[in-house]
Amino acid sequence: MKTNAAERSRYKVADSHRHQSFVGVLRRDPDTYCWTWKGHIDFADGHNFSFASERSFSTKLEAEEYMRRFACNRIDNRLDSSNGGLF
């Protein structure tokens, strides 16, 4: 029998932003029930960037939203700096 979705403690998120893919893994600590995340960005030019949360979150949704914002901001910063700020 499958475990209840509310009891899951690990989720994988795969998405892209500005044609750059990123993957994140959200994990809930079994002792504190707080969520953390780590992930990586695969830039189209072959460079990769790994990242991890430096804090914990009360809910999965809060952790996922923060992780997505972090990845999108990192992608934007790298792409904007590599082309002189032009889209």
Q: Could you describe each region identified by the protein language model?
A:
Residues 1-3, 81-87:
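Short intrinsically disordered terminal tails
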Residues 39-43:
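Short beta-strand elements
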Residues 69-81:
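Short arginine-rich
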Residues 45-65, 70:
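A short, exposed loop/beta-hairpin motif centered on an aromatic-Gly-Thr core
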Residues 1-38:
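Short N-terminal "domain-start" leader segments
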Residues 3, 11-13, 57, 63-67, ...:
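Extended hydrophobic/Leu-rich segments
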